Amino acid sequence: MSLGRLRKVELRDIWATEAQDFTPWLAEEDNLNLLGETLGIELELKGQEVSVGPFRADILCMTLADDTNVLIENQLERTDHTHLGQLMAYAAGLHSATIVWVAAKFQEDHRAALDWLNEITQDEFQFFGLEVELWKIGDSPAAPKFNVVSKPNDWLSLIHI
């Protein structure tokens, strides 16, 4: 029996830029559905590059369950303090209850910061950290995979209700 081999694909080989390639791709309905499946949340797009004062948040969605705002901030690199600050400012400016940080790789201190935020905030706020990967088998198209690295403490029990 012959089986294919998984081969990891560099994110920048598919998405050269975050703003012009990755964000529009993620905002497409099928791709938001894939992200939503990973989170256990049904998402509906409200906008891309949404103004927050003089700045722009990557993606704003709402949950279909309760119409609350979901902020999605993307980073096609290793997480950094700048994006952590942007996440907080955009979440406050857009009154987001669910905050999703998608990155190529999470530094441990940034994962710990999201875990801490999940511990200290009220139950209506949820912080997620996801690493995005791309994989191929042979000459197949690249396939995305979202890996949850940080989630609310009660997240698993909430999505099974």
Q: What are these language model-derived features?
A:
Residues 1-159:
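Charged, terminal alpha-helix-loop-beta segments
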